[in-house]
A protein has these predicted regions:
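Hydrophobic alpha-helical membrane-insertion segments, chiefly the h-region
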Residues: 3-15
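Non-catalytic beta-sheet/beta-sandwich ligand-binding modules that flank or precede catalytic cores
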Residues: 15-264
Length: 264
């Protein structure tokens, strides 16, 4: 059974199969964010799609669950602009956020309303599947971050340092790793590598009440995931990042942002 619930402009799909292996618990999936990050994608973005998308708008869409790569196709998405025009994206891809613990951010490209009009709604209209094969048809959101705004953190997951996909990422002495998922790709100002300013502006509230900075920020590639390596054993409960430190590809800086840490 599929139940669609609309709350605060976003649509959630509750899935409860009555077949073999049913757990009896509904599974709740959602679109965490849709981020109108760029109005003129550079030619280099074409490498992500396999064909020329230079000049397209770019909009990363982050899901609450990991996705099957084979199900991520343009025809599974629809963008509705503020002028009412509907746009099927030119490209839909999990690149560049395609590492083992990522695979939840779909980059959409197309004409999403740069000149006077804006993207109003994103819908899943085709057979998009979770990593476990659950359908996400019907998910949607109208909570779209506008072009002029900077990125926020939408998900923080806690992992052991030896988790598959994290080997060798963090320095010696790391006790836990917090994977931070941003709305869009982040670097330092002017596409600079992340450094001390970003590390010291990232605060972790631990279960024992202490507030600490990460030992290091790693996975410094051009996607929307950053790994915060913590030396402390007490589990991280909340992450807070000061404003103006993490910039998107358009060089828009983040607002102050915080999110509760969950088990990955």
């Amino acid at each position: 059974m599929v139940v669609v619930v609309i709350l605060g402009g976003s649509t959630f799909v509750l899935l409860n199969s009555e077949g073999e292996g049913d757990t009896g618990q509904p599974q709740n999936y959602s679109i965490l964010s849709a981020y109108h990050g760029l109005d003129q994608l550079p030619f280099a973005a074409s490498l992500l799609c396999g064909f020329n998308v230079a000049g397209d708008d770019g909009m990363p869409v982050v899901f609450s669950v990991q996705l099957q790569d084979e199900s991520v196709v343009p025809e599974s998405f629809l963008v509705i602009r503020s002028d009412g025009e509907t746009v099927v994206p030119n490209c839909a891809t999990l690149h560049p956020a395609d590492e083992h613990l990522e695979q939840r951010t779909v980059l959409l490209t197309g004409d999403f309303g740069t000149y006077g009009e804006t993207p109003h709604r994103v819908e899943v209209t085709g057979p998009l599947l979770t990593l476990n094969g659950e359908p996400l048809l019907g998910l949607s959101t109208e909570d779209i971050t506008p072009l002029e705004d900077g990125p926020r953190i939408v998900l923080a997951e806690r992992f052991a340092p030896d988790t598959n996909g994290l080997a060798g990422e963090c320095p010696n002495g790391t006790a836990q790793v917090i994977q931070l998922t941003w709305e869009g790709g982040v670097t330092g100002p002017g596409n600079a590598a992340l450094g001390e300013e970003q590390r010291l502006g990232t605060l972790m509230l631990l279960e024992d009440g202490a507030t600490v900075n990460p030992l290091a920020l790693v996975d410094d590639d051009p996607d929307n995931h950053v790994l915060a390596c913590l030396a402390e054993d007490s589990p991280a409960q909340l992450v807070e990042v000061h404003a103006g430190l993490f910039h998107d590809p358009g060089d828009d800086a983040n607002p102050a942002t915080q999110v509760v840490v969950i088990d990955g």
